Amino acid sequence: MCGIFGFILSKPLSMKEVFAVLKKLEVSKYPDEEFPVGGYGAGIAIMFADGDVRIEKVGKTADSPAGELEEIVKNASIMNAGLSNAKVLLGHVRNPSPGNMGTAKFKEAAQPFVGHFEQQLTVVSVHNGTVENWKDLRADLKEHVFESEKAGSFIDSEVIPHYFGEILLEQEDVDGAAYELLDTLEGSNAAALLQIDEENAFLHLIYKGKPRGLTVWANNKGEVIFCSRPEPVEKELESLLLSRKFKEKISISHQEDAGLKLTFRVPT
């Protein structure tokens, strides 16, 4: 299992604050859990105002992967000031299943994953859980190229943006497409997906089974924050939650079996 974090904000959040959350999230471990949420890779996807997306990620490192990624992004921001903060972001910390532990050192096996499609459609996702029917879904995506295969082992999470993109090409109903994805995925899964095309952008949150929890905060300004665990956000972004009057919209505990689909429009 892994951990996911992200947001849609009207004012940018600094990368220092982003990585403060991710570093807390990757070591999060409740007393009844055997392993922490992360520690074997980390990644972020930043969506810019023009709809372009920049992804940065690392595999397992000697110390904190989120800390290592923070340094990479900090150095990159010297050349690109747009990487110093973000209004729309997906974040991920990785703890792979035993069968995929051999891929931990490869950044290609870390998330976010992305799929590019016709009609200038892009889907970016971060995922926590296990897609039990990934082989069946992978078989329906024969023409697709998958980044994780460069690490020598296909990562089940990568079917999600590719499969969702194909659903979107077949139907115009955004909500219906997200529900279809939720229904199709077998196993315990939590995912956040950015759907971006020429005219619109949406953030979808889906949750099914027991993938270790999800908390969502929202306010009346259309802003949203989500995280697998509430503590990293409440600790590191307390002033933001208070000043912008965020309220807890959804709270699913790490032991709870639940189903959820939320869709938010991303201002473009």
Region locations from a protein language model:
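Conserved short alpha-helical segments that host acidic/polar catalytic motifs at enzyme active sites
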Residues: 1-268
